Regions:
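Alpha4 helix (beta4-alpha4-beta5 surface) of REC/receiver domains from two-component response regulators
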Residues: 77-97
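Short hydrophobic/Thr-rich beta-strand motif most characteristic of the beta2 strand and flanking loop
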Residues: 26-34
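Conserved phosphotransfer cores of two-component systems
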Residues: 43-45, 65-71, 91
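Acidic, metal-coordinating helix/loop segments flanking the phosphotransfer/catalytic sites
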Residues: 33-49, 56
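Conserved phosphotransfer microenvironments
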Residues: 15, 48-69, 80-84
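Two-component signal transduction core modules
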Residues: 50, 73, 96-97
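Conserved acidic segment of CheY-like receiver
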Residues: 2-12, 18-22, 50-51
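Receiver (REC) domain switch/output surface
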Residues: 105-115
């Protein structure tokens, strides 16, 4: 089954690097500039996975995206720690990865889709 991945990152250049990396997981990868844009897109198209920067989204927004749209979330941050990782997982995220850890992000997505 083809999956659609949406990337919301604080740095547009980083977002484009993640798009290139995510192409190994899915041919359908898009970027958005805000949580509002992501919600609008998800209301029109089936989005299976969001790769979301914790500098731009709250844990409550992550929980809301999971509840409202069923989107699997991989959080990213420039310096995630154990407390942030635990909080992200409690909010429903699959994982919380360093923002530049494309292999880890891809692995989290692939493990979720295989389950």
């Amino acid at each position: 089954m083809a999956i659609a991945i949406v990337i919301l990152q604080n740095d547009p250049a980083r977002a484009e690097r993640l798009v290139a990396s995510m192409k190994s997981v899915s041919a359908t990868v898009r970027t958005v500039q805000s949580i509002a844009e992501l919600e609008k897109l998800a209301s029109r198209l089936p989005i299976q996975v969001g790769v979301l920067d914790l500098d731009l989204v709250t844990l409550q927004e992550i929980a809301g995206l999971r509840r409202q749209f069923g989107i699997e979330i991989v959080c990213t941050h420039h310096a995630p720690d154990d407390a942030m990782w635990t909080a992200a997982l409690r909010a429903g995220a699959l994982d919380c990865c360093f923002v530049d850890d494309a292999p880890g992000i891809c692995r989290a997505i692939q493990q979720s889709m295989a389950a």
